[in-house]
């Protein structure tokens, strides 16, 4: 029996799958995927090196994919970056707690800042196109003290983000298979470490693509399977089941106690907390900057905009359907916890989704949730791991240990960072588990520690007047303010500072808002004392490029020079400025649409869903979810994927022709089918 079930009050739920299945998925499948990724990446790397000049032994390729990732793959990677286990497990459990408003506010707390990041990303492309991490930019503008402050904030962000993922995923795997939760916590990062170690950021893009495809296919399957289950049968019947659930146990703070309304005090408080927390997770997560740096300049804005809007459907549709199933069916014999309701421990551990899937699809549903949990945590964890490895290699090793570091040195440091952080995150998550902290606690309090650097970091690239002192002090003061408010309100409302009280919604909302917005006040006031006016041209004076290894090859495709060299000269300032205006428009439009114009009138009207409106609500969500699947799977193939495969095929044919003609006295270098490889002597 798993530890999660043992801790739950009432009758325990027997895991539907054996421990052997858990170990096969977590260990064997993880290593198979890692091995397959390694083999595929080795083949792809070798082919791309010969045909397009992409060499994963170069840091520019390992860390930024030569800054040439196109819109389709960028959009897919953005969807994958937010496709955390928390997105599926958390959206379902807030739906169980608050009704239909919960999953909506979960989704609305994600999409606006994903799109907003397009504005940040294009600003970096305009002002410092050769950057590898956001922390490099902080160091150049404000110096080493600020660099150390923001490096600490980013590492805190990554540590808590990984803990949030691992706590939820390990709890679900334990509940489904009976596998020990600590074993799951330590074994999940193993496969991630292997394929990230080998492939760098390109591996995370490609692996994310395949993992996201599998997750979305299963999510779409569950969205349809729900209505083929005999006790549900239709959306209208599901409406009746949820309505009956509200009569059995009405929701405090919801209009008429129903689950079928957007007028939910708890849900809107969660929405405020979630959007602030997620702004912190995005701005302070260097993996988002790495993917923005990796994208071609013309792909940043459309990639992040399409990805952000498409992503909205995943927590909204899946969370609404699965939480409604759990609410409607938990008083039936088919539900795993029958005859009791789910306990608060089970809900907070994210077990709403797996229990609902087990109800409608039996062991197949359990296996499906086990698979998507594994895929989601390994995919998103890989981005976190490479983000931290980039900090340790560029911002620690290259800056403070070996300023003359070569490509080989930095790749070695990156490899060390991958291994170190994977082990550390597993150990930190284990510590949290043993002090009684779970997915729900980390989901609620995350913003307290991730938000203090939001505005000082954004001002670094958007506001030339922020002073060095303001950049250094405002996030520190913001962190202190947020933690003080968080703990103080926990004491005020619940009479004690404990794991239980600090994980409640009100202290976390107050603490998160204080952490997010107090640094604005601190930054402006400190800047007014001694204002500065930074010259953006200073960014370009910093040498961020890396010396090439003596063994590097000069690869020329069609006589045009390396793709990296072409790319570095392809930044058109006017074009980037135009993309900046487009990014600003879509950022505002997405926030207004998803957070203001759609939900707030419904909240204020105190409207309770009728059967017809609920049916339309669910249908729109399902259609949106299926469109997201099509965008994530097929858009990368249509947007350059097939073209690159054809390019590689032509180049390989050209190489074979060049090899067969080596006896000729000369080679026609103008032929589009011929390329040259000139090794340095």
PLM region spans:
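Membrane-embedded helix-loop-helix hairpins and adjacent transmembrane boundary segments
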Residues: 1-681
């Amino acid at each position: 029996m798993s530890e999660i079930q043992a801790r739950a009050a009432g009758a325990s739920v027997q895991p539907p799958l054996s421990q052997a299945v858990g170990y096969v998925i977590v260990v064997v499948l993880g290593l198979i995927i890692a091995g397959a990724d390694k083999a595929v990446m080795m083949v792809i790397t070798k082919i791309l090196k010969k045909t397009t000049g992409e060499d994963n032994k170069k840091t520019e390729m390992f860390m930024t994919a030569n800054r040439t990732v196109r819109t389709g793959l960028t959009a897919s990677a953005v969807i994958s970056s937010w496709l955390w286990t928390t997105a599926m497990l958390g959206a379902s459990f807030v739906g169980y707690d608050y009704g239909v408003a919960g999953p909506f506010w979960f989704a609305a707390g994600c999409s606006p800042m994903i799109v907003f990041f397009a504005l940040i990303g294009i600003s970096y492309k305009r002002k410092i196109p050769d950057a590898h991490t956001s922390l490099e930019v902080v160091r150049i503008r404000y110096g080493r003290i600020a660099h150390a402050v923001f490096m600490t904030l980013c590492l805190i962000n990554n540590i808590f983000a990984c803990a949030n993922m691992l706590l939820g995923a390990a709890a679900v795997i334990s509940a489904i298979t009976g596998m020990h939760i600590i074993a799951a916590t330590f074994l999940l990062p193993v496969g991630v470490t292997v394929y990230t170690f080998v492939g760098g950021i390109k591996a995370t893009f490609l692996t994310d693509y395949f993992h996201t495809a599998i997750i979305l296919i299963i999510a779409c399957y569950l969205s349809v399977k729900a209505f083929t289950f005999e006790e549900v049968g239709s959306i209208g019947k599901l409406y009746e089941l949820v309505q009956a659930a509200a009569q059995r146990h009405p929701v405090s703070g919801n209009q008429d106690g129903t689950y079928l309304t957007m007028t939910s005090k708890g849900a809107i408080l969660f929405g405020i907390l979630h959007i602030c927390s997620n702004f912190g997770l995005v701005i302070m997560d260097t993996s988002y900057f790495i993917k923005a740096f990796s994208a071609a300049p013309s792909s940043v804005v459309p990639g992040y905009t399409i990805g952000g809007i498409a992503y909205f459907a995943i927590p909204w549709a899946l969370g609404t359907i699965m939480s409604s199933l759990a609410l409607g069916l938990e008083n039936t014999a088919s539900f795993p916890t029958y005859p009791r309701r789910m306990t608060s421990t089970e809900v907070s551990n994210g077990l709403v989704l797996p229990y609902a899937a087990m109800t409608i699809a039996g062991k197949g549903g359990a296996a499906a949730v086990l698979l998507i949990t594994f895929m989601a945590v390994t995919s998103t964890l890989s981005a976190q791991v490479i983000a931290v490895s980039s900090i340790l290699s560029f911002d620690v090793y290259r800056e403070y240990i070996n300023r003359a570091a070569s490509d080989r040195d930095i790749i070695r440091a990156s490899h060390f960072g991958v291994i170190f952080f994977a082990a550390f995150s597993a150990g930190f998550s284990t510590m949290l588990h043993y002090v009684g902290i779970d997915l729900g606690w980390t989901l609620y309090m995350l913003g307290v520690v991730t938000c203090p650097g939001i505005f000082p970091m954004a001002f670094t690239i958007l506001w030339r007047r922020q002073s060095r002192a303001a950049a250094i002090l405002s996030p520190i003061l913001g962190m202190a303010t947020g933690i003080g408010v968080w703990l103080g309100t926990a004491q005020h409302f619940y009479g004690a500072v404990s794991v239980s009280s600090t994980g409640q919604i009100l202290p976390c909302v107050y603490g998160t808002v204080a952490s997010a917005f107090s640094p604005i006040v601190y930054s402006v006031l400190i800047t007014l004392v001694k204002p500065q006016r930074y010259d953006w041209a200073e960014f370009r004076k910093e040498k961020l490029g890396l010396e090439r290894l003596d063994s590097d090859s000069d690869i020329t495709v069609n006589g045009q020079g390396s793709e990296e060299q072409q790319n570095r000269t392809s930044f058109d300032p006017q074009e980037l400025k135009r993309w900046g205006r487009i990014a600003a428009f879509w950022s505002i439009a997405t926030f207004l649409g998803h957070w203001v114009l759609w939900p707030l009138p419904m909240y204020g009207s105190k409207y309770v869903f009728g059967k017809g409106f609920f049916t339309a609500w669910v249908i729109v969500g399902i259609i949106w979810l299926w469109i997201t699947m099509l965008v994530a799977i097929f858009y990368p193939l249509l947007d350059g994927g097939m073209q690159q495969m054809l390019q590689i095929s032509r180049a390989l044919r050209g190489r074979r022709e060049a090899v067969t003609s080596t006896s000729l006295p000369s080679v026609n270098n103008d032929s589009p089918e011929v390329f040259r490889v000139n090794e340095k002597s």
